[in-house]
UniProtKB/Swiss-Prot annotation:
The lineage of its organism: Eukaryota, Metazoa, Ecdysozoa, Arthropoda, Hexapoda. It comes from the Eukaryota. One of its GO terms (biological process) is translation. The keyword Isomerase does not apply. This is Large ribosomal subunit protein eL38. One of its GO terms (molecular function) is structural constituent of ribosome. Belongs to the eukaryotic ribosomal protein eL38 family. InterPro entries: Ribosomal_eL38 (IPR002675), Ribosomal_eL38_sf (IPR038464). GO terms for cellular component: cytosolic large ribosomal subunit.
Length: 76
């Protein structure tokens, strides 16, 4: 089940939970999406500022598996 988080502070609290398994970072032209997988929900945070996204990426917990997903060209 997906859930959206609006605040960066709430996202960091969620990422530090013990049931958080991994974080996927999806980069677009206009925004960056951080998706943290917990046991029940997939929490998503959308950031439009690239500098804030880099700061958030560096402040993620070190024990968490971080995976960066690049945009693929599905329609050619």
């Amino acid at each position: 089940m997906p859930r959206e988080i609006k605040e960066i502070k709430d996202f960091l609290v969620t990422a530090r939970r013990k049931d958080a398994k991994s974080v996927k970072i999806k980069k677009n032209a206009e925004n960056v999406k951080f998706k943290v997988r917990c046991s029940r929900f997939l929490y998503t945070l959308v950031i439009t500022d690239k500098e804030k996204a880099e700061k958030l990426k560096q402040s993620l917990p070190p024990g968490l598996q971080v995976k960066e997903v690049k945009k693929t060209n599905e329609k050619l």
